[in-house]
Amino acid sequence: MLYSQKVAPYVFVLPFVISLLVFWLYPLISGIVMSFQDTSFGGSQWVGLKHYQKLASDKFFKTAVFNSVEYMLLTLLLLIPIPMMLAVLMESRLTKAKGVWKVIMYIPALTSVVISGMLFRLMFSEGDNGQMNQLMHLLGNASIPWLKEKTTGWIALLLLCMWRWTGVNMLYFISGLKSIDTSLYESADIDGANAKQKFWYVTLPLLKPTTIYVITISVYAGLSMFLESFMLWNGNSSPKNIGLTIVGYLYKRGIEKNDMGYACAVGMVLLIIALAINVVQLVATGTFKKEEK
């Protein structure tokens, strides 16, 4: 019995350890090794830093990095404050049928990105039949080639992003709000604090762990965005590469051109960029600081 009690915890953890090794550690190590190789179906050849040196002068890769970082920053500006405000509003006493609203807000996240991307592509089509151009006609304006210019194309992309992920981030913030002790708000009421002061001095500081978590996953999600852009522009063929992302370029080199070694180098640079940005934001937000006793 004593022996089985000692072994049982390891048995329960074993499936997770195996899945971690098979689906995370092994692909990561393989990707690192392949980034130093020319890999094809016929075999592999060690080329050292060739792919990384080539990346330094690859204008398409630089465009993809710029687009991905810009997209990530814009989504942070949109998908942190807006879901937070919606969560506060949802938890307000003034809001009725809270469960219904939560379901409605979360439904877009359950929708296939392939379907939602196609719908947004039709909505923002350059023809007169596109819903957005029909709206422009009602306002007395001419049709706009939405997806052919960066500004209008990115408006469509960001709207698609907000439509899909606002509800998800809102639920994260709602879970954070539920963990705040209501006695703190009661104390603030006794001190005569208004709604704005309670949000600024009670809600916002105590939502810090949730906010840091949402920022962290949003950084990774923003930098790894691919399918939304791929579906909105019907493939990796956006005008002037306005929709080309790092993962989109990885897909183009690895899948479309069968240059897996170069694609792995792209993936490793993406990993380094994502880790660097998140380490900076975690340090800036004081995540690694020890709490004072």
PLM features: residue spans?
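N-terminal hydrophobic targeting signals that begin at the initiator methionine
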Residues: 1-3
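A structural signal for multi-pass alpha-helical bundles of membrane permease subunits
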Residues: 5-293
